[in-house]
């Protein structure tokens, strides 16, 4: 991956959350883009990585949805006087990256005890589910952005997606009064190329030669005693036949003058 593509991929993480499709729509679109490559058994970088994220997101998303549904169901059995655990006692995404997965539960349980030692068991389970659901959603958001990048590189080409991310970032960072009303789209970048190719196919066989067309040569005329004669059609006239000179005598009727030697 070149420097520009690597920078564009890093900028994907800074794009707004609502820019990307929802998980269900994203996975469906990615599968549609990957299906021809799966049938052809193509081994490409973007195909392999996008396939990995499709499988990961599908499994992770179903697990996260199940955890969220269980957490919502537990709210009904939590004592109404129970105070929710504050955010300061919940493991964040950055902290979870430093904690081993096996120690994640015990670390969060210790924080709950520090907040309230006799915290109800149902509320504890609900708190754990809240933490794990949030961590999964943040991990899914990162995977969702990476999946969008890789399957769009298959659809449009890596160079086109890189150019599009650069334009979109420029548009987002420009103050509103100095930028266009609508954000750039990836289709608008490829449209001029498609139009040019279509026009080239339509005019095939009738293409005009390059350069300027030769001008038609104007026929110059000379006036000889009121008559117009074309220089290009007739034989070049002798100096005695120029305009204003008398016509030469006819050689057939001309009589030779006697020579003084005779």
UniProtKB/Swiss-Prot annotation:
The modification Phosphoserine is found at residues 232, 245. InterPro entries: Hepatitis_core, Viral_capsid_core_dom_sf_HBV. A motif (Bipartite nuclear localization signal) lies at residues 215-233. Residues 183-262 are annotated as: Disordered. One of its GO terms (cellular component) is T=4 icosahedral viral capsid. Residues 254-260 are annotated as: RNA binding. GO terms for molecular function: DNA binding; RNA binding; structural molecule activity. Keywords: Capsid protein, Cytoplasmic inwards viral transport, DNA-binding, Host cytoplasm, Host-virus interaction, Microtubular inwards viral transport, Phosphoprotein, RNA-binding, T=4 icosahedral capsid protein, Viral penetration into host nucleus, Virion, Virus entry into host cell. Residues 205-236 have a biased composition (Basic residues). The keyword DNA-binding applies. It comes from the Viruses. GO terms for biological process: microtubule-dependent intracellular transport of viral material towards nucleus; symbiont entry into host cell; viral penetration into host nucleus. Homodimerizes, then multimerizes. Belongs to the avihepadnavirus core antigen family. Self assembles to form an icosahedral capsid. Most capsid appear to be large particles with an icosahedral symmetry of T=4 and consist of 240 copies of capsid protein, though a fraction forms smaller T=3 particles consisting of 180 capsid proteins. Entering capsid are transported along microtubules to the nucleus. Phosphorylation of the capsid is thought to induce exposure of nuclear localization signal in the C-terminal portion of the capsid protein that allows binding to the nuclear pore complex via the importin (karyopherin-) alpha and beta. This is Capsid protein. It comes from Heron hepatitis B virus (HHBV).
